Design a protein with these regions (language model features):
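Hydrophobic transmembrane alpha-helices
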Residues: 1-53
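Alpha-helical transmembrane segments and their cytosolic interface
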Residues: 3, 136-175
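Hydrophobic alpha-helical transmembrane segments
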Residues: 7-12, 33, 55-59, 75-76, ...
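Short helix-perturbing small/polar motifs within transmembrane alpha-helices
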Residues: 79-114, 118
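Interfacial aromatic-anchored transmembrane helix boundaries in multi-pass membrane proteins
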Residues: 22-31, 62-91
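Membrane-interface helix termini and inter-helical loops of multi-pass transporters
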Residues: 122-137
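Mid-bilayer segments of alpha-helical transmembrane spans in multi-pass integral membrane proteins
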Residues: 71, 106-123, 147, 151, ...
């Protein structure tokens, strides 16, 4: 494909992803949902071009989100996991052993989530009350629930990829 087409499609995907990231500061619950959806959009770039191009789009969306988005916690989640995981997923799934795939996916997820927690706590200065329910400090419970959610999220990314390839792609790129 021509480089101009790659740049144009990358710009369109970047724009859509950035709009989702901007909505994190406007719509309640967007802190977690919109970074997920924004990251899923990057799979289109992986499918149409390459992971290299998708990482460029990820970088642009990350930088612009850091500058423009109101919900910095959501931006941290996007930068440290949701933005690059759908791109990395394609590389991990090239491995033959499913058990190794899942092990790597969970290692990546847990390292990223713990990093996001530490960035939020020590750089964004999110107070301990945000991680407290009924007076109990429960980040480990959040991590456990996050691991359950991750299995669902990974499956959703796979379903989105299939939906894009088999239903949406031909409608966008008519030949």
């Amino acid at each position: 494909m021509k480089k101009t087409f790659k740049i144009a499609l990358g710009g369109i995907i970047s724009g859509f992803a950035l709009v989702l990231m901007l909505l994190t500061g406007i719509i309640w619950g967007g802190t977690y949902a919109f970074p997920c959806f924004a990251g899923m959009l990057l799979t289109v770039v992986v499918i149409e071009f390459s992971p290299k191009w998708a990482y460029c789009v990820y970088g642009a969306v990350s930088l612009l989100s850091l500058i423009l988005a109101g919900d910095k916690e959501a931006v941290i989640y996007f930068i440290l996991f949701f933005g690059f995981y759908p791109i990395l997923k394609s590389t991990i799934e090239k491995l033959k052993a499913k058990s190794v795939q899942y092990l790597l996916k969970y290692i990546v997820f847990n390292v990223c989530v713990i990093s996001a927690f530490l960035v939020g706590k020590f750089i964004l200065m999110i107070p301990d009350e945000e991680f407290t329910i009924f007076g109990f400090y429960i980040p480990w419970v959040f991590l456990l629930l996050g691991n359950v959610f991750f299995l669902f999220y990974d499956r959703c990314v796979t379903v989105f990829i299939s939906l894009y390839i088999y239903r949406i792609r031909n409608k966008i790129f008519k030949k």
